Amino acid sequence: MVNPLTMKAEELKDQTEKLAVLWVSGDRDVAEKSCLMYTHAAKRNGWFDEVVLIVWGSSSRLLAEDEALQEKVRAMGKDGVILEAYIACSDQLGVTEELLELGIDVKGMGVPLTTYLKEGYHVLTY
């Protein structure tokens, strides 16, 4: 079994270069100090070729209500992070329009998430 912690950078290049981050927590500290920070850095620093942020559940409400987090997400989108959100949750929470205004692709996420998993994306959940 390959241990990615002991691999050299060149060896890591042979591994999957795609990351999907599933953001479900409504906790602001988790959002600011872990989820959004790492996700943005992963794209900006080229750690992954493709980085997807999926807003799902209570994170939808947190993002819709927090202007500082909105600015972070806008910057992530400008830097190439793919922004998606699960419409069933955002509709239930009444925040779909706010997410759309941030440039987030709000849609059914069952099939896209399943595709990410089957295509070997690295998946982080916050």
Name each model-derived stretch.
Residues Q15, A20-C35, S58-A64:
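Short, glycine-rich nucleotide/cofactor-binding loops
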Residues L124-Y126:
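Aromatic- and Gly/Pro-rich donor/ligand-binding loops
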